[in-house]
Structure formats: structure tokens, C-alpha cells
């Protein structure tokens, strides 16, 4: 057996007739498949056992030899070799064609490879191949030219005139003869000469021809092999025929297609033997050609061959193409054993690293392990009896199962898996029932809820797989979100509400002002009803044994509440005591104002003070992030579990409910509405008098109603009782927000019509009062559009993720340091005056490229090549520095990936990135996963001259595909001054920019908004009008750096507008992949052809070689490719073919004789090799896991 992990590379090429015959185990001569009576394969037919091997293991066709002992014997009666039946999956046959046939991929593809080799147009080729015209193959001494086309009539005339002194023929044989006559070296040499002088269209054609001829020359493929003499027949198990219940047969379409080929081939042989008239033979040859075309790629030329019910038959090409094709269905998406799925329910009592597995499911999943253990313990004599015991569910089986699943993590996955947190490992605990129990805190990462979601379970089998699951994938390890490095396991809903309720303060609650000696005493008083959870009390600070208190503070009384005492119990002892939800308290220490000297009148102090707000969801997030920063994973996951338990416990105790009476309607609502109506009437009067335009009237009416709604919202929020359950829910961040509340109690406000334009009649009622029929009808537009949009968006966002993954899948951290001398100058990303991404956010987790000094004191804040942490970043900001040179993926020199220093911190762990991390995939997931949160609509911005500027998901696609944007801005191509802005006759602006050398004028449409004025200095690439810049134009006018910055800024802008934070480095990885190619302009003395796309590294290699040999190097310009284009241009043909345009990619690769070096992840998944990332890298290959018996406390955080 081939060891897949020993592969160096994979090569594809054209097969010669000899090669096809050498693969074959025999010739298929008959179109028959199987005998309908005996159901055995017919001899010499498409399923023949003599050619393809026996249908039953170790049994020949006639039954003379049965049993393993005859292994390898060839039966003397039927000629079948006695062997395993699975050879029918690998043995090929062949058909000897009676006439050569052209291969449709090479003749019909775009560009036609055959046409380029022969320098004939595809139309001319088609006429020859399908027997419509003759082609001159050898003009002899006649005035005819080689490759000249002759119609039937002309051919006859020339035959009469010149007799046999020239040769012309039709069909694929003629083409084959022409292909055989080609001298590649000579042809290439003449073309290179012509290229020196050629211009325009002719030059482009020569370059294209040169490319194809060079590929043939260097790959060792013979152009004549594009015409087939022998047709391979694929193994029968790959085109099976199965019997259905009713005695009928279902068969693969390929068998029909092969049958047609064999039938026509045999008929042609017979006609040739009979010496039939030329016209009949030609017709039969044409039909054979068409049959082979249909077999290879049905429907590529003319109407597809159809089966019953007018369904086009699936040919060999269709077997590879598309989502259901071989690549995506079977090679990239395999089904796996040892897996199961079930509905999920919440498991509130689980630990962070646990999940509940239903007993019956666990028994089935761990069956082999349980059987082994049963035999080892002597509870069963052999494997068979062990299996029987399990099937009959003996009581002792459960005890064994309990022991087997200890320490054996399982993987849980929820579809759609949008990012790496969609698959995590848990330690299973057995539960009754048939539902999987899931820890509530991991729901956010999975985006799971318990309304009927299902999840899949997978069992890692080998010791290595288990170790990886435990060390890398355990849910307790995945606390941070890879896209921004913020905790993803924040409590939600009930847990937030419980902790909010727990940390509330209330005036005049029972027991206010009591002083306790320690926590136990306070809790005793609380449990016995002497003091309320929300009462402000004092406690002896020293008794809390908090390590952040100073000695003076320890001698004082701490002003707090019972609830906060309980809350602080869950935090590590060396963490500040959190008494107020402020950053100073969480990141620094408890403020001094809460410490009272002993002997002070506590009640008086309390009366003087404001109430401290309770801890909301955001604050809990901050606490988790800070605990993680200081104490790392184990401590954080323990604390999260405790926070979850507290939350559930106290939201239960709080008994917070909702009733209609909680929705209080605002008394002054009518007043506000009447006021707004009066304003609207005034606007209408102005419009009727012609003082304002219709558009202005519309804008003003909308703004009046919006203002009215905002006013109602403000009043409502102010008038609400702080203990109103609905207010508590929305304020804590558990559920709902102010706008939901306004719609319940205030007014619903303005709605949009199906086209997205706002209807100027607002909905004045609230849900509490009830809507009128018209109001209800208006509101249905928005609701329906929302649902339709969501459905469309999911598909679009998924496709974007797929393209992103494809373009970046081979970006892996390959080395420690690439030694680059470049970096990028990081400033805050701004859009006009608005800051999109702050400077500190861009700096954290990066390496400095140059040493940063304090501008005043001159002391070193961070040295060159040192990691910038949160604290250093804050120092840089405090020092007033606005720009810093940092290492960036953009400037990384590593081939096929990035280096540790240029990438910086791994957002998912908060540590340095490891060599082997698949950062490309992480980047793709981080950008794709929030895609569903982005809006679909194109906004109408601005007043009358409002042009559509794409936003949301379509804008992200536009940027990554490097398309010409909608609402394109005009940019200046030179540095200079705007000397004039004129209006032309046809209502356009003409902007004239003048530099010292030249003057350029730009035309902008009349409704464009200008961004410059006369006399202003502009730089190359600066926008003259508002709108989106075309990145390709920017690259042409300026340089790579400005394009990188522009794309980074624009993508960030879209995501930040929706409140999604993504780390810069993910977008940088993508943009770098879009800019990795250059187009050769002048080849110099090198072998590259002008106009070809080369990888930047290949280009530098070629030039370095030329300079070493003293030749003139080539010149090239950088190109920006969209992500689809960039994925198809990758060096790996396996990766490109499994992405899109499969046939085109494979045709091209075969002619070039491409080698796939298997550097990316996708190629390795396809051939079944370990991926060269993470633990699959060569450097980790030889690490063997050692099993040591360990106690539970070694591996799992215990409580």
C-alpha cells in the first residue's frame, strides 16, 4: 500500500496511447454489461471479469476455483484471475478506436489549446474535426498552403487539377497528422523572433501561442496526444450497476456513454472491413467523435446527450465538477465513522470542559473500547461474546463504559461551522435521556440555542488525536475569540441577569448600615433575613484577605453590599475586590472612597453617597478579560463556572418576571405627538407655497418624526423605575434594548417600504396600546424583508467565507523570523474626522519594527523587535505618539506563509503565535464568520444628490474581489494643484490638476460631491470627488502600500459600522494574498514571457539568476487580484481545481505538466495526507505520545 505521508509531490500530464494501454488489463470489445438471466458480467463487455477482476472474492467466473488457496491462479476455462473483488475498483480497460478522435477539453476549451498549437481558429478546427471541410496536410509541389481549408467542392476540383501530388484529409486524423508535423523548438524560436517586432493583437496572440508551445516543450507532453487513438475505460466499481427491488437495474450514466462509443466504434470497424463508401464511413467517424465528446464532457459542444426523461447524462467531467463532484463531495468532505448527532439541551451543572452524552449514544460510539475492556477484565471470553453483551445491554456494560469514557474527550460540532470555535472538545459524562447536554457558556461560540438545535459528536480514536483534543480543543482552552482576542465565553441572559441582581444597591433596604466582622457573619445575617442582598453594609476589610488591599486599607471598614461580597467570592484572592463597575477598579484596585475609618457613623456615610450601578454584561466581560490576562486559562475557566452558577442561582432567587403591567405608557406621549404633527403641518404648508422641494419636505418630515420618537424614548427611560423587570433586563444586557421598550410602551415610529425607502407616516401606537390595521400592514414590510434578507445573506456570507478560505489556506506560520527590513507605519485608521480603529488597538500584540522613544524624556518605551503589550500600547498613547513602525504581514518575506515576528500575537491564545499555526484559515474564518451580521442593503446617503454607496456584505465582497466599486470616486493621477473647476455644457464638472510637468483634467458627473477646491494641493491617488476608490486604479497611480492601507481601512470601516471588531492582521493576511502576483512587462534576457503572471518570489528568483549570469533582468508591475482570481492562480492545481472551473484548471495543468508540491492544506486533505500545519508539520511528525496513568487532577481543572 502506498504510504500517503511519504508523497513529495503530485504531477499531472497528458497520457500517451502506450501509457493508456499499459494501464489497461484488456480491451473492452462489446457494449454488453451483464447477462439479464444469470446476472453475471458478459465476456469482453463493460463489466467483464476477465478484464476487471472477479465480482466475488476469491472466485472465478465459471466457478472452477473458489477459496483463498487459489489466490493468483488464472482460471483456464474462463480466464479470470482469482483475487479480491476490490480490484474492480482499480483495474482499467481500454477501447482501441477505429479512427483517431480529438479530446474535447483541448479543442473546445477557452482558449483552444489545439488551435493555439496549430495556429488555426477554433472554427476552422471544428469544421475539420466534424467532417465539414478538408485541411491540406501536405501541399506537395502545388500552390496550396499547409493547413488551408478546402470545401468538398474545392477538394474535388484540386484533385482533378493536381491529382495525387498533394494530401488533404478531414477529421481528427488530419489534425493528428498536423500535430505530429510540428517541430516545437523551431516554432518557439520563430515566434520569439516575431515577438521582438510585433504589436497589439498580433503580439497578444504570439504570447498566448508561445505559452502553450513552451508548456508542451518543457513538460515532455507530445501535442499529438491531444488526439486519442485509445480510450481508457474506468474501473466498473466506479460506474456501478445495481439491481433495484423490481428486478430493474440502475446504472451510472457513464455506462450509457461508453456503450454508445463501443457501438459506434464496432460499426465503424465493420464498415471499414466491408470497404463501405467514403460518405458513410465519414458519417460514422463523426458520430464516434461525438460519442467520445459526450463521454468526456457532455454538453460542452452542441446539445447534450440525454437519458430517459430528457435528463442530460453525467459525463466524466461532471463527475469532478461542482458541489456534488468528486473533489468537493468525496475528497474534501468525507463522512466519518464513530460519530452521532442529537438534539441539545442545556446542562447548567456541567463544568466548563464537560458535556453530557446520552447513555445509548455513548455505548454505540465507544463500542470497540468497551469490548476490549470487557475482554481484558475477563467479563467476556472473546470479542464476539463482548459484542453480544453490549447488544443485550448487560448491567456490567455500564460500569465499563463509565471507565472507558473517563479521560477520553469527544468533539462536539454544530453546523454551520463558521469558525474554529464551531468544533470543541469536551469530557463526556453519561446522562439519561436521548439529548446531548451542552454547557451554557459555550453557546455563544457555537451560536447555539436550545430551541431544537442539533449537534454532532465525534470520537478522537488514536492517542495522538486524544492528546490534541485535550490540549488544543478543550472548551476550557477556547476562552478568547480568534477574531479580536476578546473573551467569547461571556455569560448571557439569565446569568447576566442574576449577577446584575446580585450586585444591585438599594436605598433603605433592610439591615442597611450594619457592620460585620467577616463574610460568614454577613451571610448568616442575610440567610436569616436580618439584611437584604442589596443593603449597603460595612465589613472589616482585613477579613477578606484580599491581596490587593494595602495595610492601611486592611485596618478600615469596607463599604459594600452582601451581594457584592458573594460576587467577589468567585474571583481569585489576588484580584481586586470589585465594588464599582469601573475600569480603575477592575484593572487597578478598589477605590479608597469605599474604605471608612473604624468608628465612623456608617449609616450617615451611606446616606451621603450615591447608589453604585450594578454590574452589567459589559462589565462581566471586562472582568473575564482581566482575569484571563492575569491568571490564564485554568483559573479563568474555574471562575467562569462559578459566575455561571451564581447567575443562575440569583436570577432564580430574584424571581424576575414580566407582566403587561410592567409596560407603563408615557402620560405626555400625546403632547409630543401633537407637537410633532404641528411641525409636519408647517413643513407641508411651506411645500405647498413652493418654498421647499418635495425631497426637502420628505427629509424634514422624516427628521421631525425621528426626533419625536427619540424624545419619547428619552422620557420613557427617565420615567422608568430602576427595579422594573423589563428595565433590569435591558439595562443588564440580558435581553432587549431601549428601542424594544420604546416600541412596547412609546411608539413604533417610522417604517420602511419594500424598496427600503422610509414611509413618512409613522406608526404612532405602541404594542401596549395596539396597532391599527393600517399600521400593522405597514409594519409587515420590514418584518418580511428582514427574514428574506437573512436567508439571502447566509448564503452570500458562506460563499464569501469559502473564497476567503481558499485564497489563504496555504498561509501558515513557517518560521521564527523572516529577517525583513520593512515594516508599516501604523496610525489610527480614520474616516474623515471619525476614528475607525484606534492606534492602541492596532499596536497590541504586534512587534515593533523600530525602537520607540518617549518624545519628551527620550527614554525607550519599546525596543525594536519587542512585542507591544496592552501596557506598552497605553504608554505609547500617553506619551502622545501618533504613529509607530510595526512589523506586519504586509512586509513579511517568508515564502508560502508568514513568520512569527511579522504576525505577532495569536488572538485566540493571547500568546505568541506558534510555528505551524494555520493563520490563513483563521483569518478567513474571522472575516467570514461575522459576515452574517453585516447588512445586505445599499444605503441611500445624503440629500437630493444621494448616490448609492454600497455597504455591508456587498461592500466587503466588492473590496475582496477588487471590483470596480459602485459610486466610484475620481482620483488624481499626478501630484499638483487644482487650478480650475469648470462646469461643462452637459452638466458635468471638469477638474483641472496641474503639476510642474503636466496638466490633467478629470470629468466628474454633476451630482458628484467634490472633495477639493480651487487652489488646493492634491497628491497622486487623492480623491477629487466623494465615493469609493477603485483599488486597481490606485495601484496603478500610487504604490502597493497605499492600496494595502486603503483595503484594510475600508474593510474595517464596514465591520466597525456594524459593531464587529476584527483584528487588522486577519485582513492583512487576505490583502497580502491578493497582491502576491506580478505581471511581467519586459522579459529582459530571461525565459519568462511578457504578460505572464508570476509569484513575487518566483520573479525575484528569476531575476537573481539572470543577474548572476550577467543577463538583463525582467521588469514587472504588481497586480491586484480579486480573491476568486487569486485562488485560481495558485500554484497548486489540486487546490484550484477543487475550487471552481475544474475542467479549465485541469486542462491547463495537464498541458503544462504541472507539479503540485502539496504546500497548502487543501491539496493534502484531497490526497489524504496529514495537513502541513500545526501538529501535522514535518517537525512534529516524529513525536510519539507516551501514555502515563494520571490522576484526574492532572488534566482537568477541578473545583
UniProtKB/Swiss-Prot annotation:
Cofactor note: Binds 1 Mg(2+) ion per subunit.
Swiss-Prot/TrEMBL GO biological process terms: DNA-templated transcription
InterPro entries, per the entry: DNA-dir_RpoC_beta_prime, DNA-dir_RpoC_beta_prime_bact, RNA_pol_asu, RNA_pol_N, RNA_pol_Rpb1_1, RNA_pol_Rpb1_3, RNA_pol_Rpb1_3_sf, RNA_pol_Rpb1_4
Any GO MF annotation of the entry: magnesium ion binding
GO CC terms in record: DNA-directed RNA polymerase complex
Cofactor: Mg(2+); Zn(2+)
EC number: 2.7.7.6
Binding residues for Mg(2+): 449, 451, 453
HAMAP family: RNApol_bact_RpoC
Subunit structure: The RNAP catalytic core consists of 2 alpha, 1 beta, 1 beta' and 1 omega subunit. When a sigma factor is associated with the core the holoenzyme is formed, which can initiate transcription.
Official protein name in the record: DNA-directed RNA polymerase subunit beta'
Organism, as annotated: Geobacillus thermodenitrificans (strain NG80-2)
Name of the gene this protein is made from: rpoC
